[in-house]
Amino acid sequence: MEIISYIVWGFNALILFYFLLICSIYIILNIVAFFKMIRYNRTIKYLDLKRVFKLTNYKAISVIVPAYNEENGIVESLKSLLQLEYPDFQLVVVNDGSTDNTLQKLFENFSIRQVSFTPFYKLKSQQIRSVYMSSEYPNLIVIDKVNGGKADAINAGINLAKSPLIAVIDADSVLERDCLLKIVRPFMEDENVIAVGGTIRIANGSNILHGNIVDVGLSKSWLARFQVVEYLRAFLFGRNGFDVLNGILIISGAFSCFSRDALIKIDGYRAGCIGEDMEIIVRMHRKLRKENPKLRITFIPDPVCWTEAPETFKVLRSQRMRWQKGTVDSILLHKKLFMNPAYGWIGMLVFPYFALFEMLGPVIEIFGYFFFIISFSFGFVTLSFAVAFLTTAILYGVVLSVLSVILEELSFQRYPKLSQLLTLMAAAFLENFGYRQLTTWWRFRGMFEYFTGKRHWGQMEKKGFAK
Amino acid sequence: MLKGDDFDRLSALINQTKIQPFLISRLKSGSPRKINEAAYFLGLAKSGAARNILRKKLRSQNASVFLSSALALARLNDIEVVFEIFRNAYRFKFVSKDSLLVIMSEFSSDICEVLLQNLKKEKNALIQSITITLFRHFKYYPAGEIVLKIAVYSQNKEVTIESIKYFTSIEFLKAANALRALINSPKAEIRAEVLKALAVLGDSSFEQRIWDRMYDSEYEVQYNAVTTLMILIPGSEEKISQFAYGNLKDRAAAIVRMVLSERSIKS
């Protein structure tokens, strides 16, 4: 019995150490992100971006939109994208072998006509059937290809994109009008920048008209509200914090921007990959930054892209399981980076953080809950210790989430009404009772499925934006 | 920037009422927020009475105070402080080229003469680049010769590209010979920019060099070569068409076919 007691105590001590370690990392990230945000806001405050782009030597950008069975939203989405503010951009829509009327809709609405084409680059992709150009919108081209998945479609788009910068967006993303001006700035300021990500926000509950956010709101669903807080925490603190170390390991696939040369050098996206958005960034660190450590993969905290969050448990579960599989896949594919001093901060700190806390986190947490219950049931920990530990853990989670909401309020103030702020505060508090544990469980299951061979994407249903 | 009736009304409202002393008192306060707001409105209304206080604020340790004061002085067209703004900007890590450009472009075109005198001895590539961009912005012709010398010798890509754009904007034909050398630059962005410029500044003597660039390794360069040839050489469209459809396996010809087919849709 004494040996079991030691084992249980030992494991509990390990969990406590793990908990303290992750708390310390989050606190450091919070402080770093806070100062970065202040600095960023000061920088951007005196800039009239439209004027800057009139004056300076900007780079042209190609925006790649992979589309698979998007007949319902593609027309509205493209009309909105064509209104983006940027002096020289090309919109490349890749119809990835849709089985619905996506291509037909493009014919009907954009006066596209077939053009002669030759790929400028040779990234691997499924066969391109035809390329079309719009006579109405000269900056719109449509690529029709055999189905090969998102990564494959993006590669086909890159092969035909004309501009030195490539933005990749989801067909159902809602972009802010000036998002390209903002995301391109880091490339103009520093020629070592090879990739830039921006903040993704949840659009549920907002008023969207013709593909533009006209009034930011909050969904009535608490599930969506929890995700708003989650996104604020992930983007405002997580990515901002890691950015200071040049340690961004993931840029959201909903909206990312790259130097085309960098994409070509690493042979583009990896077809068939589950988490292609993370995998490509890790590969950039591994291949390009090893050759030239000055290269930067960076992040701008501006809310530039809005996306629809799942409002049902079924879809959310599928999404989280897929994300976890993507994380595991990317980390295992590039395990060479783990504690490898040749990769600097990435190898010694950021990658181990992702492996230990993002990949293994759900496993440790689930076992932690399990052992905690066992310890308590068998009297290895006292009631007062159990209550103190749980209260600290939950309070800490609440503080982190509330800080994210406060930082949002101090910086971008996209939720200006007091009622919205109070709702977000409530969500920041409530998400710690059930929601967080549920997502941990789904991530655990995602990992389990990954290792038992179920590595498919799963279904991702979206309601779509009504207007 | 306010102009016309809007400017007159705001200027009268601030300069001829008690708002001006109120804003100046805020400018003298210790709060960066109050200073920034006051500087913004005094600059917009071109309140000369604030000039001396704003000049002192350029030495502020607070970056936002420095930037708002510099912007206000630029709107007041206080050309004497141009180089003080450049010098002080270096104290702050995050005062970018963009911020400086936006501030400098608020001055009137009179700034160009001062910048031209400085450019003759300026070695800093960032200031050279900003200066040339401003010459382009104001379409300032007298700087052509000096910028030409810089463009030929500069090792800085930004400076070279800004120079080429400047030559194009003022149609500085003397730059054509310099472009002859730059068309083979190892930097693709420069080659692409030269080809664009040749559409305005070049002549038929460039024809062979432009044809050579159709076999460039970079798409932008190839694309610009085709479009420049069509603009620059009368009757070249037919020759280009023959090239495009007579060499079906040639990569350069494939790109030309694409450009031609795009052009037919656009037209």
Cite the ranges covered by each PLM segment.
Chain B
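Structural detector for internal amphipathic alpha-helices that build alpha-solenoid repeat scaffolds
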Residues: 4-14, 36-45, 67-78, 87, ...
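Short inter-helical turns and helix N-cap capping residues of alpha-solenoid HEAT/ARM repeat scaffolds
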Residues: 30-31, 61-65, 92-96, 123-124, ...
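Structured extramembrane domains adjacent to transmembrane segments
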Residues: 22-53, 62-68
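Amphipathic alpha-helical scaffolding segments comprising HEAT/armadillo-like alpha-solenoid repeats
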Residues: 7, 11-27, 47-58, 79-89, ...
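Extended hydrophobic secondary-structure segments
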Residues: 213, 221-222
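N-terminal cationic amphipathic segment used for targeting or macromolecule association
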Residues: 229, 242, 246-250
